[in-house]
Swiss-Prot record:
The keyword Transmembrane helix applies. It is found in: Endoplasmic reticulum membrane; Sarcoplasmic reticulum membrane. PANTHER family: HVA22-LIKE PROTEINS, RECEPTOR EXPRESSION-ENHANCING PROTEIN 5. The short lumenal loops between transmembrane domains 1 and 2 and between transmembrane domains 3 and 4 may impart a wedge-like configuration, thus deforming membranes. InterPro entries: TB2_DP1_HVA22. One of its GO terms (biological process) is regulation of intracellular transport. Keywords: Endoplasmic reticulum, Membrane, Sarcoplasmic reticulum, Transmembrane, Transmembrane helix. It comes from Homo sapiens. This is Receptor expression-enhancing protein 5. Expressed in heart (at protein level). Expressed in circumvallate papillae and testis. Pfam families: TB2_DP1_HVA22 (PF03134).
Length: 189
């Protein structure tokens, strides 16, 4: 690791949160530097993502669990800048999930797929202003959306109208069935 990256990594490992508190306890009990403990855990997770059973679940927990937790904290904070950061992540995560749905049957056979996917998701959620989610959103998703916004709005409106019509028809039929059922009960008593 370069000196600057190592210093940044060490600073990150000394920030106050539940994970660094756990690392501090492990460091105190074992006498092993928390950087080495963290790198060991990262190495074990990487190996598990390559060879472990349920690597897909672990990868999805990493890509979903932490961002969901931080998103809730962002919603509850008065700062709206972090809301935008995590909304951007979720847009990229959604687009990635849709693309992955169609390609997963082929990609999951590659031995390093889940490790690469996990690395991609970590890059997207990295705590930096130029993380992967921001980059992908600004360079790919936003231009595509702005180019096709009116067509997408039209499709969404049509789907919404059809869903409302269907819900209204089902409600009307349910009311008729209820009235008929109540009418038959009155006749039988």
């Amino acid at each position: 690791m370069s000196a600057a990256m190592r210093e940044r990594f060490d600073r990150f490992l000394h920030e106050k949160n539940c994970m660094t508190d756990l690392l501090a306890k492990l460091e105190a009990k074992t006498g092993v530097n928390r950087s080495f403990i963290a790198l060991g855990v990262i190495g074990l997770v990487a190996l598990y993502l390559v060879f472990g059973y349920g690597a897909s679940l672990l990868c999805n927990l990493i890509g979903f669990g932490y961002p969901a937790y931080i998103s809730i904290k962002a919603i509850e904070s008065p700062n709206k800048e972090d809301d935008t950061q995590w909304l951007t992540y979720w847009v990229v995560y959604g687009v990635f999930s849709i693309a992955e749905f169609f390609s997963d049957i082929f990609l999951s056979w590659f031995p390093f797929y889940y490790m690469l996917k996990c690395g991609f998701l970590l890059w997207c959620m990295a705590p930096s202003p130029s993380n992967g989610a921001e980059l992908l959103y600004k360079r790919i998703i936003r231009p595509f959306f702005l180019k096709h916004e009116s067509q997408m709005d039209s499709v969404v409106k049509d789907l919404k109208d059809k869903a409302k019509e269907t819900a209204d028809a089902i409600t009307k039929e349910a009311k008729k069935a209820t009235v008929n059922l109540l009418g038959e009960e009155k006749k039988s008593t």
